[in-house]
């Protein structure tokens, strides 16, 4: 066969003869001859006779390996796909021919938003519309050779960005009328995670704190969190608002200085808890749980004295009232127990003494208590179910076996409430070396009294983990109203805090707390290096913090308490008493768990603190991960003695009191420290204020006698601290806005701190002898009455003796040892 090849445009033909094999789809063609003809531009056209070789004569497609001219031009066969909204840049690839090339679209059309560069051959731009586009591109080279190719370009739709979403927590909570609840919002798929808050009833702050309205019937409100980045996206939840329980009219109210006293006091006398019903006797081997389940309101359950009841026992909810209590007690008669209002000791469980503890002063040991023990590690043995109420427990030993961790001997089930509970003349204890975190965990309880009881061996050995903070009594955590509480005439022993309110997640502050006539104690045999040292099973010392601490509480009366033994060396520094409202982080420093936490209206009076590394710590500060508390103010501290403050012996700062405040927290204000007797070796007052200008407000330190220490008024550290210069008058003026420092006797102030550096009306006895105490005893267990001849007799602003009212203290702490 023969083909004629006519060049459509003029160019110089190749002189070489065609004679190449051409690849055909079904075989081979062989040029056997060719013919040249002349085109209109005077150049010869060329033809070739092709002979078929192979089995088939069908020619469906072919390409020339060499068409006989000096060059050829070829266009690429495909383009990469495009996406709407994304920049596109592709090159129409050309091979052969002579540059420069010229490109053009000769049929069809490019996607909207794209264009073809006629000289570079690039197709670029930003496509607008998705679809499949067909078009033909022609390429012509400098010699007039051309080729064209039909393309099919796919343009995909733009990917849909994930929509902004909002989640709110907690979902569907229940709150009491007139109370507050913290809500949180999580915004996803945007870098702007801010929300605006709104509610259909009550009020809500910009940080998500919902204040429920006062209601007389149960109602609801809707809380809404709306994305700032995309206001069309929001989340909501329904809040059920219940009617608050009626508040019992205050039995005693008023103020002590700036602090409001408790409005309500728990009544816990036997006559206040009548049980006129039946007697249920449970002997050794019997089922306490069956008895609890079967008891009717007004019944008394007698547990065999001297017997042990092993298990975890749940006190169920029953419809009891103030005239029908359920009493669970030892079967021993009242005549062999200490009288009501008298503290029990381990003597009544057959133990005449315990190592390192004060003497029990019992003539003989007799086991008249019923013993309840958890059989293994965990929580128990006593748990109060949701709604449990009107239970009085008397004459019971509550304990645990050796080995493992026990978290709370007596507790409420998590997240539930219980009310009207009295723990009377009980011995709660761990084992000498095992970790036992709590004696009583108050949880969301109301109207609870712990009276005339004895707590020993609550301790932890871990700096982090499951057991870091041991307490005899703990409360102030949860999302339910808490209080009033009565903690009166107990021996309270714990390595961490003997009593702690707060330190965990909460949306309420426990209120109306009475802490009176207790002995708070840590055995010195727990201090490493002491004779008879006792630590954990591996020899690690127990973690010691302080004797009494408030992180979340309001209206607290702390009166007539004896506090002994606190040392540092762990996360705290051996203070006796600590007031630090805290928006707590958990043990691994995540989360601000208590933005509603506060410490307000605290009265501390007629008490003693002894054998400590430091006396008082009062601070409004951020938590370890930057959370701020709600408030900390209105403290009245008067008529206390703080002796045997020894920083060297007890591993701490050797200071009487510290006042501290950091930036971004409520101002520490309305603090009264009056009529105090103290003997710090290092510093009378440490001040820390890192607020870039804000001052503590209305701070009063009056009518006291204290050792000056080596550095009487001292900075807690830092170049930005207002107390940086460590001079009394300069510090007071820089750190306090409105303060009083009047009629204080500062014993032994050195010449480095002359009277000119102190406020006027300050007295400067050169030594303790000049103060004329009845019996100073080097500031350790002395008689701190002033002699009639003392120059500080009747020298107070109120006409009283300077220092603590020792007679009033002795009356309040009588028989507290």
Predicted regions, residues:
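Beta-solenoid repeat scaffold
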Residues: 270-274, 297-304, 310-371, 385-394, ...
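Acidic, glycine- and Ser/Thr-rich low-complexity intrinsically disordered tracts
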Residues: 247-278, 342-359, 363-367, 538, ...
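Right-handed parallel beta-helix
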Residues: 325, 389-400, 417-431, 446-461, ...
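Acidic Gly/Asp/Thr-rich repetitive segments characteristic of extracellular carbohydrate-active
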Residues: 179, 184, 267-309, 314, ...
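Strand-loop-strand motifs at the edges of beta-sheets in extracellular beta-sandwich domains
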Residues: 110-128, 136, 204-215
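Bacterial Sec-dependent N-terminal signal peptides
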Residues: 31-72, 157-160, 244-247
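Short glycine/proline-centered coil/turn motifs in the loop regions
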Residues: 95-99, 108, 188-191, 200-202, ...
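Extracellular beta-strand/beta-solenoid scaffold signature
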Residues: 323-326, 367-384, 404-414, 432-443, ...
